[in-house]
């Protein structure tokens, strides 16, 4: 009987704390409503800059040392078959005055 009471107390405490985390506890409903409209406006606002999904190209700004202009060049691979063409790896190197430098 004692263990049953302890279990009931624990479960009520556990679920009570779970609900307290997810339910808003505002004493003024109008303040909660204003906050929600502000949050919705922020979600609907378009970003100032466009973000592209995926990884970025390597940066060659410091790869060539004092040589300039240091620019990024894509190294091409010849794939063995047409089926492998979609998964053919892409590699980059930094070039300055016909000399190649490794990408940092």
Swiss-Prot record:
Q: Where is the protein situated, by its record's location annotation?
A: Secreted
Arranged from A to Z, the UniProt key words for this protein are:
Developmental protein, Disulfide bond, Glycoprotein, Secreted, Signal
Per the UniProt entry, the signal peptide is 1-20
Asked whether the keyword Signal is assigned, the reply is: yes
Broad class of the protein's primary localization: secreted
Which terms under GO biological process does the entry name? negative regulation of stomatal complex development; stomatal complex development; stomatal complex patterning
Induction entry: Not induced by high CO(2).
Give disulfide pairs as residue numbers: 60-94, 64-70, 67-96, 79-88
Tissue expression notes: Expressed in shoots, but not in roots. Mostly localized in developing leaves, specifically in meristemoids, guard mother cells (GMCs), and young guard cells.
The UniProt entry, under Pfam families, shows: EPF
Q: What happens when the gene is disrupted?
A: Increased stomatal density and violation of the one-cell-spacing rule (clustering of stomata).
The family database entries (InterPro entries) matched by this protein are listed as:
EPFL (IPR039455)
Q: Which GO terms describe its cellular component?
A: extracellular region
Q: Which residues are glycosylated?
A: 98
Query: Membrane as a keyword?
Result: no
What's the superkingdom here?
Answer: Eukaryota
Indicate the family of this protein. Answer: Belongs to the plant cysteine rich small secretory peptide family. Epidermal patterning factor subfamily.
Q: How does it assemble?
A: Interacts with ERECTA and ERL1, but not with TMM.
Function noted in UniProt: Controls stomatal patterning. Regulates asymmetric cell division during guard cell differentiation. Mediates stomatal development inhibition. Not cleaved by the protease CRSP (AC Q9LNU1). MEPF1: mobile signal controlling stomatal development in a non-cell-autonomous manner. Uses ERL1 as major receptor. May act by competing with somatogen (AC Q9SV72) for the same receptor, TMM (AC Q9SSD1).
Protein name listed in UniProt: Protein EPIDERMAL PATTERNING FACTOR 1
Provenance organism? Arabidopsis thaliana
Q: What is the lineage of its organism?
A: Eukaryota, Viridiplantae, Streptophyta, Embryophyta, Tracheophyta
């Amino acid at each position: 009987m004692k263990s049953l009471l302890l279990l009931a107390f624990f479960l009520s405490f556990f679920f009570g704390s779970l609900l307290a985390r997810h339910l808003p506890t505002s004493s003024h409903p109008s303040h909660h409503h204003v906050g929600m409209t502000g949050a919705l406006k922020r979600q609907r606002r378009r970003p100032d800059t466009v973000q592209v999904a995926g990884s970025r190209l390597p940066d060659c700004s410091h790869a060539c040392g004092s040589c300039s202009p240091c620019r990024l060049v894509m190294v091409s691979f010849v794939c063995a078959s047409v089926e492998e063409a979609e998964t053919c790896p892409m590699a980059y190197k930094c070039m300055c005055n016909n000399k190649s430098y490794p990408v940092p």
